[in-house]
A protein has these predicted regions:
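Charged, gly/pro-rich active-site loop segments
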Residues: 1-12, 85-142
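Short beta-strand segments
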Residues: 24-59, 73-77, 87-89
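Structural motif corresponding to alpha-helix initiation and N-cap regions
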Residues: 14-15, 60-61, 120
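Generic structural signal for secondary-structure transition and capping sites
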Residues: 25-26, 72, 117, 141
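Short secondary-structure boundary segments
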Residues: 78-80, 138
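Short, surface-exposed beta-strand-loop junctions and turns on beta-sheet-rich folds
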Residues: 61-63, 82
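Short, basic/aromatic recognition patches
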Residues: 2-28
C-alpha cells in the first residue's frame, strides 16, 4: 500500500521522479559501512510501485552485511552534469528470503533483457550471480 512518499505527480518534480524510476536502468544505492563511511554503488533496480524498489545483489556484496546491521539507505540518480536533475530517495532496506530470482521476476527480467544478454551469459547467469533480493521501502524523496 502506498504511503504517498513520492512527490505529487501533477508537479514537474513528481513527474520527473516517476519517469526516472520507471525508465532509468541504474541508480546509486548508498549503504553505511562498519566504520560509518557511506558506501555508494551503482545497481540495477526495479520500481515495484509507489514506495518500493527491488535490487538483486551478489551474495558476497558488502552491502548485504551493511543492510543487516544498518538498514537505512539512500538512493540517487545521476544528475545532469551541472548539479541539476538530482533525485535523492531515502528509506529502509530489507533482505528477502525465498524471493524469486531475477530471471523469474518477469518485470525485472524484461527491463534488463538486453543488458543480461550483453553483459552476462543471459538472464539465468545474472540470476545465479546476483541471487540476493533486497527491497527498499522509500520514506523520503528530495
Amino acid at each position: 500500500m502506498a504511503n504517498d512518499v513520492l512527490p505529487d505527480p501533477s508537479t514537474t518534480f513528481g513527474k520527473r521522479v516517476r519517469d526516472r524510476l520507471a525508465k532509468e536502468l541504474v541508480l546509486w544505492l548508498t549503504t553505511v559501512g562498519a566504520d560509518g563511511t557511506p558506501q555508494p554503488n551503482p545497481v540495477w533496480f526495479l520500481w515495484e510501485g509507489e514506495d518500493t524498489i527491488l535490487v538483486y545483489n551478489r551474495p558476497d556484496a558488502n552491502r548485504i552485511n551493511h543492510v543487516r546491521l544498518r538498514p537505512r539507505v539512500a538512493l540517487n540518480f545521476d544528475g545532469n552534469g551541472l548539479g541539476g536533475e538530482i533525485v535523492v530517495l531515502t528509506g529502509t532496506a530489507e533482505l528477502l528470503e525465498d524471493f524469486p530470482l531475477a530471471h523469474e521476476n518477469e518485470p525485472f527480467a524484461e527491463k534488463y533483457a538486453e543488458r543480461t544478454a550483453g553483459s552476462f551469459d543471459g538472464p539465468e547467469d545474472f540470476a545465479r550471480k546476483y541471487p540476493v533480493a533486497m527491497r527498499i521501502r522509500i520514506s523520503r524523496v528530495r
